[in-house]
Amino acid sequence: MLKAICSSKELTDNSYYDCVSDLIGSEQVQELKNITHHVSTTRFQHCVNVSYYSYIVCRKFKLNARSAARAGLLHDLFFYDRKEYNASKIKGQASHSKKHSMEACANAAELTHITCLERDMIEKHMWPATRPMPRYKETYIITIIDKYCAVLEFCVPRVQRFIAGKTR
């Protein structure tokens, strides 16, 4: 069963899945299931969350929802450990925010053809922490949705544990 955080919809049964079905089963994307992300989720689940909600918002505003879904799924397609990278960082070395965006973009381009729009979305999803500014409306949307999903991934499990503790 494939779902986004705070959604009850089965994602394999709707138009969203048509946009990402060729990517989601790939070995590289599936590897993300083994990496913890934002404390209580996996990098795979985070990417699905960003992908799905970016798709929904872009569709609502009649923007390129297909590219948003694809870029959202691939925006964190990197495999190094962020904590190790930051601990061993030397002067002049790119920040994690910049490095992982560029690495995810390179990995995405190895996996599939990415459009200029998708490249902008993946490379700049950490704006304003990184430069330059996004070129497209869809890039601003994925940037906002990425932060929104990070907050949900951090807070929702805590709220669920709190509620479960109250009902005992």
Where are these regions (language model features)?
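Metal-dependent phosphohydrolase cores
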Residues: 1-168
